[in-house]
Amino acid sequence: MIPKFIAFQFKKPSGLFGIFSSNLMVKRNQKNYDRLIKDLNLQSQDKILEIGYGPGVGIRMIAGLNSSCTIHGIDFSKLMYKIATKNNKEYIDAGRMKLHYGDFLITSVLDNDYDKVFCLNVIYFWDELKSPFAKVLSLLRKGGTFHIYMADQNTLVKMKAPDSVFNKYSIGEVVEALEAAGFENILHYSEKGLYIKARK
């Protein structure tokens, strides 16, 4: 069973426990990022947004793989903003990356012409899917894609992740919410978790 306090640190890391959870994220998420970034199918001049960048592992990987991408990110943990900014200083200084601190649902700092938007292990922390998916749709250019990685519902149940922190969505619920938001060509597959792709 995951204690509620620890679970909340995965949602919004802060303080010393936040640093610990950040280090754990780096180790646990590496392979998931490898697969998700492969699915992004990076192209020259892509403009990319990560929602919930954590310590900045994924965006750093993208910056290292494709020097022509413009990379933006937003996270509502001030600690993660500080750590990710430090970890990606060279890309930020070079003007290739821009990181924001805040809630992506209410912020006005993001653009509306991203080629790809992605999030990894974030969806559980949204109490409903209608508003987040509508927001993502508004941030994408026509033909742009939204990529999600999430642990499957059964895994979260077995982990005994607290319901007060983790929303244990089924793949059916996610697909239905994506369709309702206006996404098309929704694809998903399972590989030690669920990978989902949807097109605007």
Q: Residue locations for each model-derived region?
A:
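A short glycine-rich, Lys/Arg-flanked "PGG" loop and its adjoining helix->strand segment in the class I
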Residues: K130-K142
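Conserved SAM-binding loop and adjacent beta-strand
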Residues: F17-I37, N167
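Short alpha-helix
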Residues: F166-A181
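Class I SAM-dependent methyltransferase SAM/SAH-binding core
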Residues: L49-I106
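Conserved beta-strand signature within the Rossmann-like core of class I S-adenosyl-L-methionine
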Residues: G143-M150
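A short SAM/SAH-binding and catalytic strip from SAM-dependent methyltransferases
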Residues: K116-E128
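Core SAM-dependent methyltransferase catalytic element
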Residues: F183, Y189-K200
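A short acidic, Gly/Pro-enriched loop at the edge of an enzyme's catalytic core
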Residues: L105-V117
